Amino acid sequence: MLQSNEYFSGKVKSIGFTSSSTGRASVGVMAEGEYTFGTAEPEEMTVVSGALKVLLPGTVEWKVYTAGEVFNVPGHSEFHLQVAEPASYLCRYL
């Protein structure tokens, strides 16, 4: 079953799904902007297109991730994103 989600007044949209190859996951698109997300469980984020500038929990320096790159976010934490142009991602819930 697919589950549509919308955040930040429609600037971030995702579709959640479960498959045998990825497990529980979502794919989404982010418009230009700055966002803060909270996690309930660990997440593995893969940038599909564009770039995400990310500030991970416990770090002080922003890092840019581009298409094909992966970053991990601990559960029960917050991470910050800056998006300069529309970008897409795959988020796996670990």
Curated annotation (Swiss-Prot):
UniProt xrefs under Pfam families: Ppnp (PF06865)
Enzyme class: transferase
Database matches in Gene3D superfamilies: Jelly Rolls
Gene Ontology molecular function: any one: thymidine phosphorylase activity
EC code: 2.4.2.1, 2.4.2.2
Swiss-Prot/TrEMBL keywords: Glycosyltransferase, Transferase
Catalyses which reaction(s): a purine D-ribonucleoside + phosphate = a purine nucleobase + alpha-D-ribose 1-phosphate; adenosine + phosphate = alpha-D-ribose 1-phosphate + adenine; cytidine + phosphate = cytosine + alpha-D-ribose 1-phosphate; guanosine + phosphate = alpha-D-ribose 1-phosphate + guanine
Domain of life of the organism encoding this protein: Bacteria
GO cellular component, one term: cytosol
Extent of the signal sequence: none
CDD domains given in the database record: cupin_PpnP-like
HAMAP family cross-referenced by the UniProt entry: Nucleos_phosphorylase_PpnP
Chain's role: Catalyzes the phosphorolysis of diverse nucleosides, yielding D-ribose 1-phosphate and the respective free bases. Can use uridine, adenosine, guanosine, cytidine, thymidine, inosine and xanthosine as substrates. Also catalyzes the reverse reactions.
Family to which the UniProt record says this protein belongs: Belongs to the nucleoside phosphorylase PpnP family.
PANTHER family given in the database record: PYRIMIDINE/PURINE NUCLEOSIDE PHOSPHORYLASE, PYRIMIDINE_PURINE NUCLEOSIDE PHOSPHORYLASE
Name listed for the protein in its UniProt record: Pyrimidine/purine nucleoside phosphorylase
Originating species: Salmonella typhimurium (strain LT2 / SGSC1412 / ATCC 700720)
